[in-house]
Amino acid sequence: MSVLYPLIQALVLFAVAPLLSGITRVARARLHNRRGPGVLQEYRDIIKLLGRQSVGPDASGWVFRLTPYVMVGVMLTIATALPVVTVGSPLPQLGDLITLLYLFAIARFFFAISGLDTGSPFTAIGASREAMLGVLVEPMLLLGLWVAAQVAGSTNISNITDTVYHWPLSQSIPLVLALCACAFATFIEMGKLPFDLAEAEQELQEGPLSEYSGSGFGVMKWGISLKQLVVLQMFVGVFIPWGQMETFTAGGLLLALVIAIVKLVVGVLVIALFENSMARLRLDITPRITWAGFGFAFLAFVSLLAA
């Protein structure tokens, strides 16, 4: 059971990831007064792509071909350790904060260098922008989660979630500021406007995707959808853990599952509302905005020292 449960959780998240992307697309269309493609359109697109031949540039190497599978594999690994219906991590051995952040860094690293491996200047520029965005957002996420870890006295995600679940009043200010910083970082990591647009594979920001086609592109799209879901679930599971089970029961599992679905759907709709109220930023303006998120993380750190 201890091995089966995290595997089932990862596979379920993998299966529903395109559905959450579909809900986002429908919400965006409704906010634009359009009908939209339907919540299952992501599945149709991916299935169609998986049935086609994957063709890459002549100059591309093994990194370009391997990256889609690395993206999916890394995100599935992270998904096994996230608290979804329980307060504790289903796989405590993998549920260390530093380990999870390194896994996210591996996925970003491969995504960036896959753009450099094509020999195309267009994808290379997109890869450099992706790397720069990572430099801006990862310190914010790391510092925010580290403050929460210091409050919990452990870097294990189960202990952090349990501490937030019981919410120590004496540490409310650091936790609230850390929550704001991580919410900011989550928004950026999910590839949303004004920083990015996850469906814009023909544009410069998503340049590394422009050379993929067929089954490779389908796997990559599924991996990006899974990354968005995993990033959102990590934030929701750690900082909004209420409704998750402390002890495993059949009735509690059903209730926790319903609450988890509601939290994810509400999160997706709130993010869609925010991103559709803003225009995309120029790259040179992006660092000025991300400083606000890092400011929340730094204030959380200072308030932790002062507490």
Swiss-Prot record:
Any GO molecular function: oxidoreductase activity
Bilayer topology: Multi-pass membrane protein
Superkingdom of source: Bacteria
Pfam family for this entry, one: NADHdh
Biological processes per GO annotation: anaerobic electron transport chain; anaerobic respiration; formate oxidation; glucose catabolic process
Topological domain spans for side Cytoplasmic: 24-67, 115-131, 189-221, 275-284
GO cellular component, one term: plasma membrane
Keyword Kinase in record: no
Keywords, ordered alphabetically: Cell inner membrane, Cell membrane, Membrane, Oxidoreductase, Transmembrane, Transmembrane helix
InterPro entries in the cross-refs: ComplexI_Subunit1 (IPR052561), NADH_UbQ_OxRdtase_su1/FPO (IPR001694), NADH_UbQ_OxRdtase_su1_CS (IPR018086)
Subcellular locations according to the entry: Cell inner membrane
Spans traversing the lipid bilayer: 3-23, 68-88, 94-114, 132-152, 168-188, 222-242, 254-274, 285-305
Residue ranges annotated as Periplasmic topological domain: 1-2, 89-93, 153-167, 243-253, 306-307
Subunit structure: FHL comprises of a formate dehydrogenase, unidentified electron carriers and a hydrogenase (isoenzyme 3). In this non-energy conserving pathway molecular hydrogen and carbodioxide from formate are released.
Entry similarity comment: Belongs to the complex I subunit 1 family.
PANTHER family: FORMATE HYDROGENLYASE SUBUNIT 4, FORMATE HYDROGENLYASE SUBUNIT 4-RELATED
Entry protein name: Formate hydrogenlyase subunit 4
Organism: Escherichia coli (strain K12)
